[in-house]
């Protein structure tokens, strides 16, 4: 793990959280219980405070940053997809930000909302609870259905379970030179196949 103090502020990481060794946490960063921080994530608390609350996940290649005197917050059980950028915003409890989305300064994503992949949420946007947001700029297109929220929660549970799996078995190694016979497949802990 790459942890850096900045002007006397040291990242705080709950002992039950998992932070991938290639992730970088700088300065005023607070990571809660059971959080998953993926490979190559950058949480740069050298201006504003970054808070990742319990049970949330920040996936591979995500960036969190914010201006001075602001808090960038991912609420409890928040789900931040691969490559997303969060800058000076608040992601509500149990909300999902899709892959490669950008959420700008002062934006608030409501609880249990879903931001579709590749969306751009403008600075100052004020979302409501359980909205499906999409587009560039993003706008609310409808409410999140019960099935969609259930699917989101299953996916978040996969990452919460992955925390323990990583603590138990993830370690650096050398590659094999060829695939072994009867190579096993990894199994998740829930069925997250989207319904059609």
Curated annotation (Swiss-Prot):
Q: Where is the composition biased (Polar residues)?
A: 187-196
Record GO biological process: carnitine metabolic process
Q: Which parts form a coiled-coil structure per UniProt?
A: none
Does the record's keyword annotation contain Repeat? yes
Report whether Transferase shows up as a keyword of the record: yes
A Pfam family hit: Hexapep
Q: Which UniProt keywords apply?
A: Repeat, Transferase
**GO molecular-function term, one example from the UniProt record:** transferase activity
Q: Entry's CDD domains?
A: LbH_paaY_like
Pathway, per UniProt? Amine and polyamine metabolism; carnitine metabolism
Which portions of the sequence form the region Disordered?
Answer: 173-196
So which domain of life are we looking at? Bacteria
Query: By its UniProt entry, which InterPro entries does this protein fall under?
Result: CaiE, Hexapep, Transf_Hexapept/Carb_Anhydrase, Trimer_LpxA-like_sf
SUPFAM superfamilies from the entry?
A: Trimeric LpxA-like enzymes
The record's comment on protein family reads: Belongs to the transferase hexapeptide repeat family.
Q: What does this protein do?
A: Overproduction of CaiE stimulates the activity of CaiB and CaiD.
Protein name per the record: Carnitine operon protein CaiE
